[in-house]
């Protein structure tokens, strides 16, 4: 991508608000094929206004990172994408989250089917209390009826994609709890991709891991984007710079700046972003 292509422009909207200054907006339009388009998103924890008028296009087949200080709303934004908040009546989202033209906030689609399309891996590895094999097969069985031979192939495929197969192929019947922390997190990623989602959400996937395990997860993220749209929340700015194609900086529930990762880290538009990137704030 050349410098001309990385110039930050305002996110495409039907009309621009009065006084809108593209040079100061800090927001860029993602490539022409956004996988997810977020329009005027607001989110509330009861009366607390956690996300404020978020407009963002998440490009297909790329890695997008959400960065910002603790409490800025990046994990909240991530969890709106597959409606994790639906478990809590006091939480609500307003606006649009469009995926293939469908508003995920108002769709009548079964929530489990939505989460099959948009998988999620959490901060702490969460293997199920069952064998390594069954950890992978469990989700698949919810949506597909496969003969044993095909299930075996799916399990091997998912573990291979997660760079774990060679380490566990001789102990598939053993508990997932017996794996190291890094292996457990890769098991959770394998479990997520086994149902073949279109989007994979990663919420601080390396925060509890050692540097070697973190490096393996980062290599895996780079490989996964060839098949999935990946969105990652991270406090580690170096990780965002290494892993992502696009970066969104958030502060106090607002999207401050979004654009090509290299541009965000080398020449951000907004002073708030520069202060955070350089360590003068946050």
From Swiss-Prot:
Pfam families: ABC_tran (PF00005). It is a peripheral membrane protein. Keywords: ATP-binding, Cell inner membrane, Cell membrane, Membrane, Nucleotide-binding, Phosphate transport, Translocase, Transport. Its main location: membrane. GO terms for molecular function: ATP binding; ATP hydrolysis activity; ATPase-coupled phosphate ion transmembrane transporter activity. Part of the ABC transporter complex PstSACB involved in phosphate import. Responsible for energy coupling to the transport system. The complex is composed of two ATP-binding proteins (PstB), two transmembrane proteins (PstC and PstA) and a solute-binding protein (PstS). This is Phosphate import ATP-binding protein PstB. It comes from Paraburkholderia xenovorans (strain LB400).
């Amino acid at each position: 991508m050349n410098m001309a292509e990385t110039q930050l422009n305002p996110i495409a909207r039907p009309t621009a608000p009065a006084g809108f200054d593209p040079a100061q907006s800090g927001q860029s339009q993602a490539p022409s094929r956004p996988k997810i388009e977020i329009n005027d998103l607001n989110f509330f924890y009861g009366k607390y206004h956690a996300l404020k008028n978020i407009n963002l296009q998440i490009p297909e087949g790329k890695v997008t990172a959400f960065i910002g200080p603790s409490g800025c709303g990046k994990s909240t934004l991530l969890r709106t994408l597959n409606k994790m908040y639906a478990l809590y009546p006091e939480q609500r989202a307003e606006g649009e989250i469009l995926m293939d033209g469908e508003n995920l906030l108002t769709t009548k689609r079964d929530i489990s089917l939505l989460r099959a399309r948009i998988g999620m891996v959490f901060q702490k590895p969460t293997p199920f209390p069952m064998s390594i094999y069954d950890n992978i097969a469990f989700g698949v069985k919810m949506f597909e009826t496969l003969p044993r031979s095909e299930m075996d192939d799916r399990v091997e495929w998912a573990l291979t994609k997660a760079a774990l197969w060679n380490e566990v192929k001789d102990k598939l019947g053993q508990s997932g709890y017996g794996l190291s922390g890094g292996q457990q997190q890769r098991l959770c990623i394998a479990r997520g991709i086994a149902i073949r989602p279109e989007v994979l959400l990663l919420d601080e996937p390396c925060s509890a891991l050692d540097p070697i395990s973190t490096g393996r997860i980062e290599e895996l993220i780079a490989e996964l984007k060839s098949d999935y749209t990946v969105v990652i929340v991270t406090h580690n700015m170096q990780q965002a710079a290494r892993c992502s194609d696009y970066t969104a900086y958030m502060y106090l529930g607002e999207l401050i700046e979004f654009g090509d990762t290299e541009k965000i880290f080398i020449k951000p538009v907004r002073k708030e972003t520069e202060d955070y990137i350089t360590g003068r704030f946050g």
